[in-house]
Amino acid sequence: MRADAPQPDVICAMAIAARGAGRVLARSTTETRNKALMAAADALRASQSELLVANARDVAAFTGAAAFRDRLTLNPERVEAMAKGLEQVASLPDPVGHVMAEWDRPNGLRIRRVATPVGVIGMIYESRPNVGADAAALCIKSGNAVILRGGSDSLSSARVIHAAMQAGLKAAGLPVECVQIPPDADRAHVASMLGAAGLIDLIIPRGGKSLVERVCAEARVPVLAHAEGLCHTYVHAAADLEMARRIVLNAKLRRPGICGATETLLVDQAIAPKILPGLIEDLATRGCTFRADARARDIVPDLPAATEDDFATEWLDAILSVGVVDGVEDALAHIARYGSAHTEAIVTEDEVAATTFLNGTDSAVVMWNASTQFCDGGEFGFGAEIGIATGRFHARGPVGLEQLTTYRYEVIGTGQVRL
């Protein structure tokens, strides 16, 4: 083993320390956890100069695409936004101890289901420094210890942010092991986290398709994840044309690179000749390009032809796949074939059609007369989010504080024994 290789038990030791620290955190008061977050926000502001210098080193060494460089880059405004994000999480209701349900049995037993922390969370993410701050804040508030493994591109930035989070914990009298990062960027740490069954309770990956697919394939720990955000907007025959125009422009172009951006536009054949030419022109003048099926090209002939793979592609760019469909059921069949179970939207004034679409779409989030870009923890009122989940168990959609809890049953008796 080379001298600078990570020791095999680094993640194991961190997880054991996190387990002990997490027990203290889980039993702490709301006020104590809020104090930690407010103090961490102050520490982040105080370390702004150090953080920007560290971030400049990360950016200077970065060799990837411009869009990823922008996500990596910090400035004073983004540092302040991170600090305000910590304060916002502190202001949110505490999910720990919330009585989710309560009932009495005929024998006099009172049973209640109470929200509790998950335990130790492993967060694996790519090069966005703010993700580490958001994840740490949500885990602290929900009583979970967390191990943050960010991308190697942002390691210098992550260390300064981590120091600020630990300063906040220390100021509140909480164990600093509640928030930890590996000592270096060695990829072996990812494999160790994925194999840490019994030590880490939940893995949350946040990043590109290849990262998420690797985590889901190799993890021996439960995972909350989404591999792609292949979102659809369906313009129904009974859509308000101006509303549809506004929604489609926003859903595609507000921020094309986020997972809630619409990647495929489906237009009902009954309305396509009326709306499609003008809508394509509006999108094109804003820099959008297209991949269209044969029926869409019959209406707008100069559109580039779509391949089968195009409708299964998450573009993350100002590119839109366009198809014409024969009503709600045809739209649902297209989404079932190509979608990623993330977010779908219908634009219509027909309540029956909307209800059919809402009930027939097997995705984490389904919208009626709204942009798919509203799939966001902040927009849902969750405060910050730690990611989006498209699986079928524990949590679906934006993952906020409530989704970072599990529950226990408390049974209160007056001396009952079972016959």
Which residues does each PLM region occupy?
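Short beta-strand-to-turn element immediately C-terminal to the catalytic PLP-Schiff-base lysine
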Residues: 234-238, 265-269, 324-325, 347-349, ...
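C-terminal segments
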Residues: 3, 8-15, 322, 349-419
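Substrate-binding/gating loop at the entrance of the active-site cleft, primarily
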Residues: 102-146, 151-161
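NAD(P)-dependent aldehyde/semialdehyde dehydrogenase
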Residues: 269-371
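N-terminal Rossmann-like NAD(P)+-binding subdomain of aldehyde/semialdehyde dehydrogenases
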Residues: 1-111, 138
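Solvent-exposed alpha-helices and their adjacent loops that cap or buttress functional pockets
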Residues: 102-103, 111-117, 139-140, 171-175, ...
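ALDH superfamily catalytic-core signature
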Residues: 8-9, 46, 126-145, 160, ...
